[in-house]
Amino acid sequence: MTVAITDVVLRDAHQSLFATRLRLDDMLPVAAQLDDVGYRSLECWGGATFDACIRFLGEDPWVRLRELKKAMPKTPLQMLLRGQNLLGYRHYADDVVERFVERAVKNGMDVFRVFDAMNDPRNMQAALQAVRRHGAHAQGTLSYTTSPAHTLQTWLDLTEQLLETGVDSVAIKDMSGILTPHAAFELVSEIKKRYDVTLHLHCHATTGMAEMALLKAIEAGVDGVDTAISSMSATYGHPATEALVATLAGTPYDTGLDIHKLESIAAYFREVRKKYHAFEGQLKGTDSRILVAQVPGGMLTNLEGQLKQQSAAHRLDEVLAEIPRVREDLGFIPLVTPTSQIVGTQAVLNVLTGERYKTIAKETAGILKGEYGRTPAPVNAALQARVLDGADPVTCRPADLLKPELAQLEADVRRQAQEKGITLAENAIDDVLTVALFPQPGLKFLENRHNPAAFEPVPQAEAAQPVAKAEKPAASGVYTVEVEGKAFVVKVSDGGDVSQLTAAAPAPAPAPAPASAPAAAAPAGAGTPVTAPLAGTIWKVLASEGQTVAAGEVLLILEAMKMETEIRAAQAGTVRGIAVKAGDAVAVGDTLMTLA
């Protein structure tokens, strides 16, 4: 049985290795070679690529898809879709899901790997059915995790539910690299024994088990696996394509791929990758912490960067210890986008505020309320009661509570475009969907579509070279520097040599800084200061000057780590000295306002 290979070099590889920064201009020169390999498919879209395109790169993701399809007409293109969340961080009404899938197919997408962070099949149903209606390949997904609530029967039941919904294949998505070789063999064997289904396996290499898991799954009968070209593999990423091709050559599982063609592609990316050095994580080998904390590799990179931005890098071990506790409180949910961000951010809040759940992120409350779907196990009853505040939890498919919203979204985007003098794309619906998924970054992108200066500068090859010694000696130390909304951790040695340069986790791009002093320097007035628990961007200021507020009332909403955190009044009082406005970037401890 020939094993099919999906290469993830154009999507998950660079998402895992250097924060989704690979640009279209670095993809197109090698596209013809990739198209000539004979892959089952090439993953090139979805996941975080859509967000990164409009937030950091100034690229239109729809144009990227069309250009890749034009450059690789022979190989099916594949994307990762978050079910009812599409590519955003909330549930969308069914009419938005339908239209997004339709436009993705029209622009060139062939294979949709559809997953749900809760493993709730109801949240995958609309997307999977839309994919099949529009003639593309619908792949349902098991987001693999382990917990007291997850057994072999859990995965067999979910497979059956996906087959009942209607899928063309099923993928096992091991986003944390915690699938052991023997568990892989058992899981694949039992699924293939019971169901007539094409089965695919996706593993991350972070713990060092992925290659063994793939091989045991192949022996058990898996039909296809994900790999990444060698120069874009390993650490936070995936097993190397060439290694698996060589391993299976001459066996009944021979992939039929030409390793010489693969080496040529690897050589290309070996050089291209140097340009993105500043965005790479610090992992050089494997990371056993993930086996204990069950944290996906990409999430670990983000946590390291986020804590540096919060001036709390030394508290990583405390956060790693807190993550399993938060996950249990939230019903042992899998740690995959967006739940990995939700659990990680809540763990950071619990540690940095010094009190568990002193601040509950909006998204954490959403899981407790049932707004994200059914959790694998019951959530913490006391926490749920606290956020429900007497209301009933959501028990139906969450999207059933959403009215059709596409018409209103389209009207809103067209109105904003007219007000701001924005020329929409020829197929305006694509721009509408971009803003629907990412309201603030999407609108900023449309305003600056032809203004590269509004986004991150294009990385240059020389950025990976050693920095020349400064003429004037500089003090040694480790500094965090922010450039275009991106935090970099720079280690300067005696004499001014930059001996280490790493990128912290992506932060939401803040609005252009005002000419006035930063928030921390603004007059706060007399009274008890309300301070920022995290570094981030002010999303909304809800309180007004002179307003009387009760203890627990929401004063502001802070966007940090791609999540909204409500800042509440610790006591009753009168709002004085509001020091921030929407769009302001704030640091940990900045005074936002005072309560007199």
Swiss-Prot record:
Disulfide bonds: none
Assigned keywords, A-Z: Biotin, Ion transport, Sodium, Sodium transport, Translocase, Transport
Modified residues (N6-biotinyllysine): 562
Single GO MF descriptor: decarboxylation-driven active transmembrane transporter activity
Annotated Pyruvate carboxyltransferase domain residues: 3-263
Record bears the keyword ATP-binding: no
Native organism: Klebsiella pneumoniae
Record field: compositional bias (Low complexity): 516-526
Record domain Biotinyl-binding: where: 523-596
Substrates-to-products reaction catalysed: oxaloacetate + 2 Na(+)(in) + H(+) = pyruvate + 2 Na(+)(out) + CO2
UniProt keyword Cell inner membrane present: no
Gene Ontology terms: biological process: gluconeogenesis; sodium ion transport
Protein name: Oxaloacetate decarboxylase alpha chain
Subunit structure: Composed of three chains (alpha, beta, and gamma).
Region (Disordered): 503-526
Gene Ontology CC terms, in alphabetical order: cytoplasm
SUPFAM superfamilies per the UniProt record, alphabetical: Aldolase (SSF51569), post-HMGL domain-like (SSF89000), Single hybrid motif (SSF51230)
Membrane-spanning ranges: none
